[in-house]
């Protein structure tokens, strides 16, 4: 028991030791890479082991403090309570700023560890530089953690008898899965950044670095997309207003690096396969990681008031801003000073290179538009004190047409060839796709019963993407036959097809749920009912229940259609007793083609309640499409050629180690 009293101090010591190892990892291998000293470069390996092990130990210490209700630790006292269920005790470890930053540092250490383990066949000088850059990033976050955000600070000598409890919004499975997935994506872009900076330091921007960094970038992009999808799903059912995206600044902060990351993985493919867009690809790698740091600044600086933002103080914001400026300024300085790279490879207008460049431009313009809409109100407020809100009308008006254009380019890009595509051949490929898309869109519109132009256009674009993929599959298997040819297609190819289908499915969900949702607010007493979109909702009243750390008024709503009961929903109004916070828990009947969503408002006396009812068609397709896209990315990253062909690529690049 006595030894347990020192667990927080052990955790703090491990963070400091991890910082020491990060310094060794950042400095020694980089110094060794300059003259080609193998011994110094090899020290990156034990340094990354030490950093990751000590961060894992520190995270374990903080977890132990939560699980044992150690309220002498300020972070535990502020974000836990003895009545909190054990699974929320565990997720509370990263439920606020300090713990989430420790999780960020741990995941960064994990990415570094993974790169060093799975990249052993790289030239030693390249690997040393990559690990050194990742060590520098770790130094920044660990200094931020230790100096301004120590999760092990004590509340001595006055130890509270109980904690202040975890924010009721976070007492949900969403906290268990959403932040780790999001951070895996955020931090994962540091790998692409590290490879890009290592290539700049080596003075050689060839196709090799693109091949080495591409699978890591795809994995990071997939995790970030899955994290964003889970966050949207969490907000939908937890916040009680029935929405899944509000263009909140913190939502935008996660979406921007995903958009630039999407451009990056396509640009890496061009650089790897054709040796073009080399400088542009490096710039995208820098931008993707810089945007993740911007996201950290927006969430943790206190400049935003958002349901997603951590309450913070200006000191933390200044630290992150300095770190962001250091990373962006330093990397752009290296980029500008790098030798000009001229591609010796040409390509024509109708080529995959051109279409992927168009893909990149659309995605970067979309990200820039979101960046402008997110930062402009903050800059205006800082300079003049004027308050301005940039909301959904701005973002929807600009973003939706860009995404429509992207889906057009996406389908054509799958069918065109590298370097040059005969126009006659391309027309022959696209004509049946276009005709089939129009036919499918009309049939789908008739079956759906809505010829709204937005809905019809979305059906057309989704069919366009789907049929282009099918046409390409038939084209690639035509020599061997479909049954014999399908097994020869690579995981990377299938991952690309699945990800594109996921985008189409998500687009259908977005438009159909937005255009055709029905909503109604009404005062209902027990036994009263309402009708909405062909459904009959009968309110049977609410009963009082006691939870582990809350009290609840749980309603019962029966749903009838065509005289048959199809669902019983139980919306709740919860009072979390420790913080005296009132929360809404929606009652949802999820279906493949629609969600029935009921939320309780305020009690109105005599057993009556304000009741909000939504009927949301195809809303689940949004998250299914997002998860499908992420799965496609992970499948592509598992392609066998990244493991088998890496040896030949390394042999091609071995001259790098001797020349620089």
Curated annotation (Swiss-Prot):
Record's keyword terms, sorted: Cell inner membrane, Cell membrane, Cytochrome c-type biogenesis, Membrane, Transmembrane, Transmembrane helix
Where are the bilayer-spanning segments? Answer: 15-35, 49-69, 99-119, 126-146, 181-201, 216-236, 250-270, 279-299, 318-338, 360-380, 395-415, 426-446, 450-470, 493-513, 618-638
Q: GO molecular-function annotation terms?
A: heme binding; heme transmembrane transporter activity
One Pfam family name is Cytochrom_C_asm
Q: Which GO terms describe its cellular component?
A: plasma membrane
Task: Name the domain of life.
Answer: Bacteria
* Location of the protein in the cell: Cell inner membrane
Where this protein primarily resides, as one coarse class? membrane
Q: Which GO terms describe its biological process?
A: cytochrome complex assembly
The annotated topology with respect to the bilayer is: Multi-pass membrane protein
What is this protein for, i.e. what is its function?
A: Required for the biogenesis of c-type cytochromes. Possible subunit of a heme lyase.
- Output the PANTHER family linked to this UniProt entry: CYTOCHROME C ASSEMBLY PROTEIN-RELATED, CYTOCHROME C-TYPE BIOGENESIS PROTEIN CCMF
For this chain, the family text in UniProt reads:
Belongs to the CcmF/CycK/Ccl1/NrfE/CcsA family.
Record protein name field: Cytochrome c-type biogenesis protein CcmF
Lineage, broadest ranks? Bacteria, Pseudomonadati, Pseudomonadota, Gammaproteobacteria, Pseudomonadales
Name of encoding gene: ccmF
């Amino acid at each position: 028991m006595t030894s347990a009293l020192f667990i927080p101090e052990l955790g703090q010591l491990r963070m400091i030791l991890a910082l020491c190892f990060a310094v060794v990892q950042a400095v020694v291998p980089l110094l060794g890479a300059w003259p080609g000293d193998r011994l110094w470069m090899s020290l990156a390996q034990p340094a990354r082991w030490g950093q990751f092990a000590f961060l894992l130990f520190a995270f374990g210490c903080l977890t132990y403090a939560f699980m044992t209700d150690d309220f002498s630790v300020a972070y535990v006292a502020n974000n836990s309570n003895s009545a909190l269920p054990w699974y929320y005790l565990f997720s509370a470890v990263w439920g606020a700023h300090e713990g989430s930053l420790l999780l960020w540092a741990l995941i960064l250490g994990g990415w570094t560890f993974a790169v060093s383990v799975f990249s052993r066949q790289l030239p030693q000088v390249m690997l040393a530089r990559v690990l050194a850059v990742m060590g520098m990033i770790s130094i920044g976050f660990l200094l931020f953690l230790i100096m301004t955000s120590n999760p092990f600070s004590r509340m001595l000598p006055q130890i509270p008898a109980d904690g202040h409890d975890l924010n009721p919004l976070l007492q949900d499975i969403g906290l268990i899965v959403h932040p780790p997935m999001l951070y895996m994506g955020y931090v994962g872009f540091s790998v692409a950044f590290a490879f890009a900076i290592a290539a700049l330091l080596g003075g050689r921007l060839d196709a090799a670095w693109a091949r080495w960094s591409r699978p890591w970038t795809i994995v990071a992009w997939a995790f970030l997309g899955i994290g964003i999808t889970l966050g949207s799903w969490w907000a939908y059912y937890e916040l009680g207003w029935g929405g899944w995206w509000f263009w909140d600044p913190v939502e935008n902060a996660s979406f921007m690096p995903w958009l630039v990351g999407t451009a990056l993985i396509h640009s890496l493919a061009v650089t790897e396969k054709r040796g073009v867009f080399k400088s542009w690809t490096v710039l995208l790698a820098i931008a993707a990681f810089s945007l993740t740091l911007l996201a950290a600044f927006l969430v943790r600086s206190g400049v935003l008031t958002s349901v997603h933002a951590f309450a913070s103080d200006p000191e933390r914001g200044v630290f992150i801003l300095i770190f962001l400026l250091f990373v962006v300024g330093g990397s752009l300085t290296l980029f500008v000073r790098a030798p000009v790279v001229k591609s010796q490879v040409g390509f024509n207008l109708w080529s995959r290179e051109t279409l992927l460049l168009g893909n990149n431009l659309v995605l970067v313009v979309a990200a820039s538009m979101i960046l402008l809409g997110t930062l402009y109100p903050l800059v205006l407020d800082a300079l003049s004190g004027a308050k301005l809100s940039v909301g959904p009308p701005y973002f929807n008006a600009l973003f939706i047409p860009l995404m429509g254009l992207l889906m057009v380019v996406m389908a054509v890009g799958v069918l065109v060839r590298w370097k040059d595509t005969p126009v006659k051949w391309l027309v022959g490929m696209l004509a049946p796709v276009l005709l089939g898309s129009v036919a499918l869109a009309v049939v789908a519109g008739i079956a759906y019963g809505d010829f709204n132009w937005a809905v019809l256009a979305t059906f057309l674009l989704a069919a366009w993407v789907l049929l282009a993929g099918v046409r390409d599959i038939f084209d690639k298997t035509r020599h061997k036959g479909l049954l014999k040819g399908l097994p020869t297609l690579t995981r990377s190819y299938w991952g690309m097809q699945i990800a594109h289908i996921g985008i189409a499915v998500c687009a259908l969900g977005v438009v159909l749920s937005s255009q055709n949702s029905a909503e109604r607010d009404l005062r209902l007493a027990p036994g009263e009912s309402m009708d909405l979109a062909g459904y009959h909702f009968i309110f049977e009243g609410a009963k009082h229940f006691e939870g582990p750390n809350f009290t609840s008024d749980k309603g019962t709503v029966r749903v009838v259609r065509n005289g048959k009961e199809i669902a019983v929903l139980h919306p709740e109004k919860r009072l979390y007793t420790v913080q005296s916070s009132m929360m809404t828990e929606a009652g949802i009947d999820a279906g493949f083609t629609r969600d029935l969503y009921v939320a309780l408002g305020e009690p109105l006396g005599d057993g009556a309640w304000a009741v909000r009812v939504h009927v949301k068609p195809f809303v689940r397709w949004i998250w299914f499409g997002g998860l499908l896209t992420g799965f496609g990315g992970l499948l592509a990253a598992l392609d066998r050629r990244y493991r088998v062909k890496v040896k030949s690529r390394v042999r091609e690049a071995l001259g790098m180690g001797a020349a620089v």
